[in-house]
Amino acid sequence: MEATTAQANELERRVDLSIAIADVEKEMEQRLKRMGKNMKVPGFRPGKVPFNIVKQQYGDQARHEVLSEELDRVFGETVTEKKMRVAGYPRIEPKTTESNSHLEFSAIFEVYPEFTPGDLSGSEVERPVLEVSAAEVDKTLDILRKQRVSYADADRAAAKEDRVVIDFTGKKDGVPFPGGQANDYPFVLGQGMMLPDFENAVEGAKAGETKTFDLTFPADYHAKDLAGQTVQFDITVKQVQAPVLPELDAEFATSMGIADGDVTKMRAEIEANLKREVKRRIEGKLKDQVMEALLKANPITVPVALVDMEIQRLMQAARQDMEQRGMKVKDMPIQPEWFADQAKRRVTLGLILAEVVKTEKLQASPEQVRTMVEETAQSYEHPEEVIRWYYAQPQRLQEVEGVAIENNVVEWVLSKAKVTEKAAVFDELMGQKQ
């Protein structure tokens, strides 16, 4: 066996491999003899099949297997000797040669980039600061009450947040159009279930009232035959129901999982949950900025092979997600280019994070993993069961360990970067509409 190496570009390498034909033929003969011992051919006793018949039937298979194994061995020895970190799989190409004693091949592959983590002293990170107040607890309670709203008949004109039940018929040029009719149709005013002009026409009407009005569909309306068209609706309001929010009492507290119905305990639990969520959101904001800082400080070239593999992984995840949603994947072809940028970013960050962790020794400790598991478990009704669930499977702990390592990297970057604090607005941080 002989091997030479060459550098094609920044990450691509070529290894020229030379394999002795005699070695291949020798191993091939030994393999065929072993196969012949178990071969059954009519007219011959088991294990007594002539070698030429064994070779005729299995020679090509044996030669392919031996050559493949020899190439793998020679390639592995070469890259190990040269201390090359191979990214992906090599492409093996036969070479034209006049040699009668050797088979010549080229293995083309990529290697991992070698780099030293860049300087982060000039990076700027903004740390959101927010203390959960009684006002946030009250606002959360209001949201929870609205999620449990009931409705009662109201003898008045319909207003926003009321639920109305109507019959309606839509006509275009005096003719009812498909999808434009319904009876006993309920919806809540102000939730955007109907077009704004439709809701405006219903608002102010009382039960038993009938109205006729014109409505122009938006130019980008999903039904192309109605987009931009003006139609006429006839409606009859059958019910107007006002929202009734549950009282903040023991019954409500019990419905929220407080066994003894203690409202004070309920508020304390909501506050604790909000603090955990605020902490998680702030950590997420910091992490996003840290990752951007790492990308900016480390403009590395990444192996195309790794990006292609990540694209395939993302495509498979997208297919599974679509299937879980009841969608037919075959009817919605997924294109690799949709995931190219995301895949390249993920691969780049993965390589940078791995190098930072190795260089700065930022591996997660068992104590750190345990703390994270316990913190996660606190948001469940039976924390001890959740902790046992995590420790029952090594893979679950590995996922937590991965997050812990990322947290270590975030803290390390924050120790190097210029960090300024900025007061955060609760609704903005939580992604809620004001």
Curated annotation (Swiss-Prot):
Residues 161-246 form the PPIase FKBP-type domain. Its main location: cytoplasm. One of its GO terms (molecular function) is ribosome binding. Keywords: Cell cycle, Cell division, Chaperone, Cytoplasm, Isomerase, Rotamase. It holds the Pfam family FKBP_C. It catalyses: [protein]-peptidylproline (omega=180) = [protein]-peptidylproline (omega=0). One of its GO terms (cellular component) is cytoplasm. One of its GO terms (biological process) is protein unfolding. It is found in: Cytoplasm. Its EC number is 5.2.1.8. Belongs to the FKBP-type PPIase family. Tig subfamily. Involved in protein export. Acts as a chaperone by maintaining the newly synthesized protein in an open conformation. Functions as a peptidyl-prolyl cis-trans isomerase. HAMAP family: Trigger_factor_Tig. NCBIfam families: tig. PANTHER family: TRIGGER FACTOR CHAPERONE AND PEPTIDYL-PROLYL CIS/TRANS ISOMERASE, TRIGGER FACTOR-LIKE PROTEIN TIG, CHLOROPLASTIC. Consists of 3 domains; the N-terminus binds the ribosome, the middle domain has PPIase activity, while the C-terminus has intrinsic chaperone activity on its own. This is Trigger factor.
